[in-house]
C-alpha cells in the first residue's frame, strides 16, 4: 500500500511565544530567552518549528545576530 499513515492525532497549532506572553521588545542581552530559539548546533530555528509570527521572527533574528557579535551567544556550538 502506497502512501502515508492515515488517522492519528491532528497537529496542534503553534502559537507565538511573544504575542501570548505580551512581549513587545526582544532584548539581545536576554540570552536565556534567545537560547530557546537557537538549536543545539547554534542555528536559528525557523518559524515553522518555533511558531513565532513573522514580525517577531525578524526581531528575534536581529537580536540573536547582535548577541553573537557582542559574544553573548556562540556562532556555533562547541563540540
UniProtKB/Swiss-Prot annotation:
CC per GO annotation: cytosolic small ribosomal subunit
Top-level taxon: Bacteria
GO biological process, any: translation
Bridged cysteine pairs (disulfide): none
Upregulation: Strongly expressed during exponential growth, decreases 2-4-fold in stationary phase, part of the rpsF-ssbA-rpsR operon. The operon is induced by DNA damage by mitomycin C.
Keywords recorded for this protein, A-Z: Ribonucleoprotein, Ribosomal protein, RNA-binding, rRNA-binding
NCBIfam families: S18
Subunit organization: Part of the 30S ribosomal subunit. Forms a tight heterodimer with protein bS6.
Function according to Swiss-Prot or TrEMBL: Binds as a heterodimer with protein bS6 to the central domain of the 16S rRNA, where it helps stabilize the platform of the 30S subunit.
Listed name of the protein: Small ribosomal subunit protein bS18
Gene: rpsR
Amino acid at each position: 500500500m502506497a502512501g502515508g499513515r492515515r488517522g492519528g492525532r491532528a497537529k496542534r497549532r503553534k502559537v507565538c511565544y511573544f504575542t501570548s506572553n505580551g512581549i513587545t521588545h526582544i532584548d539581545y542581552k536576554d540570552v536565556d530567552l534567545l537560547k530557546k530559539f537557537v538549536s543545539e548546533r547554534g542555528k536559528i530555528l525557523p518559524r515553522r518549528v518555533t511558531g513565532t509570527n513573522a514580525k517577531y521572527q525578524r526581531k528575534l533574528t536581529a537580536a540573536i545576530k547582535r548577541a553573537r557579535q557582542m559574544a553573548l551567544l556562540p556562532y556555533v556550538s562547541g563540540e
